[in-house]
A protein has these predicted regions:
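Catalytic core of non-heme Fe(II) oxygenases with the double-stranded beta-helix
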Residues: 59, 66-178
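Non-heme Fe(II)/2-oxoglutarate
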Residues: 1-80
Length: 178
């Protein structure tokens, strides 16, 4: 299995999450594809409005993502992993993220194990903005509906095609070993 997709949150928890994010994210505080402070992001590779969030502000969300990771890969018990990074992404016209992996390089304890993407909102008229995860040369198009989450190994190649109409907002969580 290359990924797991499901509705992780009930409607009330999801609405609370969106409300909290709306307060914290505010577009003036978000940065158009500049990445973390001091980092340059090549706009040919990635274009979106981004905001890094403190995962400790969203403990219920993080617990659900950790449980989903355990369901996806039972050898990774929720007690041995934790969400350490959250990022809000808003994709508008021409925004995209070319094929890439999320697993970084470095010591094993600092390598992302899982990537999750939760669809917060998308316009009814959205064209493009398609998420694909690749298994060898096979492309798996993942049609996330609002409120759904997909989780996959951070070593999996994936991409978001350019949005040509409408837009989408997602919350990305990265899970590490504790």
């Amino acid at each position: 299995m290359i990924y797991i997709k499901k509705k992780v949150f009930n409607d009330i928890i999801f609405e609370d999450l969106c409300y909290d994010l709306e307060d914290e994210v505010g577009i003036p505080a978000a940065i158009k594809s500049r990445g973390k402070e001091g980092m340059y992001v090549d706009l040919d590779i990635r274009s979106a409005i981004t905001k890094h969030l403190d995962s400790t502000h969203y403990p219920d969300f993080c617990k659900e993502i950790e449980a989903l990771a355990e369901e996806f890969s039972p050898r990774h018990l929720a007690s041995t992993i934790s969400v350490k990074e959250l990022e809000y992404l808003s994709y508008g016209i021409s925004d995209h993220f070319k094929i890439h992996q999320d697993a970084g390089h470095g010591s094993l304890e600092h390598v992302r194990r899982f990537t999750s993407i939760t669809m917060l909102s998308k316009t009814d008229d959205m064209i493009g903005g398609q998420l694909s995860v690749f298994d060898n040369d096979e492309e798996h198009v993942i049609d996330l509906q609002v409120g759904e989450t997909v989780l996959f190994f951070s070593t999996a190649w994936h991409q978001v095609t350019a949005v040509t109409q409408g837009g989408r907002e997602v919350l990305v969580a990265w899970v590490y070993d504790r």
